[in-house]
């Protein structure tokens, strides 16, 4: 347990007894963070990394890491409230109990994601893949992807940073088994 200093300077143990401790056999993915309180009945506001942001509510259960212990966090209900996501955590009934969760990152197991069709990939599958152009020059490794609104862009770090649109004709092939992405991209761009 971790001591949490509350606004009135009283210490209280952060107790997440409603959670089940477990060990991850599966890769975990960061999907959001509890960032503030909502109301007085123990609801919390969630900053979601999912797109669209309300999709975070469909990935249940959430997993949290408290003092190096992975735990399952049960959500009783959640919804979109104006421009934010709010949720009620099981066995949390007031704002003082909810305060202990502020700042905690929310994860899911990768196995919780829906199966994709052949040729479709989650961004997480592409991070770390080596990117090679048609001239067989290694541009670097995918460090991130950016959604520009019209298409996604691979951010590649190598001798220099490259931003390659993740669309045809620039994207030629993704080979997950060999950890390679083949692109039609000049090394000087």
Curated annotation (Swiss-Prot):
Protein name from the UniProt record: Ribosome maturation factor RimM
Pfam families from the UniProt entry: PRC_RimM, RimM
Gene3D superfamilies, per the entry: PRC-barrel domain (2.30.30.240), RimM (2.40.30.60)
GO BP field: ribosomal small subunit biogenesis; rRNA processing
GO MF annotation terms: ribosome binding
Function as written in the Swiss-Prot or TrEMBL entry: An accessory protein needed during the final step in the assembly of 30S ribosomal subunit, possibly for assembly of the head region. Essential for efficient processing of 16S rRNA. May be needed both before and after RbfA during the maturation of 16S rRNA. It has affinity for free ribosomal 30S subunits but not for 70S ribosomes.
Signal peptide: none
HAMAP family, A to Z: Ribosome_mat_RimM
Domain notes: The PRC barrel domain binds ribosomal protein uS19.
Localization annotation: Cytoplasm
Organism name: Ruthia magnifica subsp. Calyptogena magnifica
Cellular component aspect of the GO annotation: cytoplasm; ribosome
Family stated for the protein in its record: Belongs to the RimM family.
Keyword set, alphabetical order: Chaperone, Cytoplasm, Ribosome biogenesis, rRNA processing
Main localization (coarse): cytoplasm
Assembly with partners or alone: Binds ribosomal protein uS19.
Domain PRC barrel intervals: 118-189
């Amino acid at each position: 347990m971790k001591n949490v200093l509350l606004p009135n300077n009283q210490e209280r143990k952060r107790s997440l007894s409603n959670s089940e401790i477990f060990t991850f056999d599966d890769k975990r993915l960061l999907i959001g963070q509890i960032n503030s309180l909502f109301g007085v009945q123990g609801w919390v506001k969630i900053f979601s990394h999912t797109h669209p942001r309300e999709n975070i509510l469909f990935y249940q259960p959430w997993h949290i890491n408290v003092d190096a212990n992975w735990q399952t966090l049960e959500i009783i209900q959640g919804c979109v409230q104006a421009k934010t996501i709010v949720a009620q955590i099981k066995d949390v009934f007031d704002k003082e109990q909810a305060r202990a969760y502020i700042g905690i990152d929310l994860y899911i197991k990768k196995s919780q994601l829906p199966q994709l069709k052949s040729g479709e990939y989650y961004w997480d599958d592409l991070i770390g893949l080596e990117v090679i152009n048609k001239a067989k020059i290694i541009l670097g490794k995918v460090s991130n992807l950016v959604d520009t609104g019209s298409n996604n862009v691979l951010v590649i770090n190598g001798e220099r940073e490259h931003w390659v649109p993740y669309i045809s004709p620039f994207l030629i092939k993704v080979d997950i088994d060999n950890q390679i992405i083949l692109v039609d991209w000049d090394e000087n761009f």
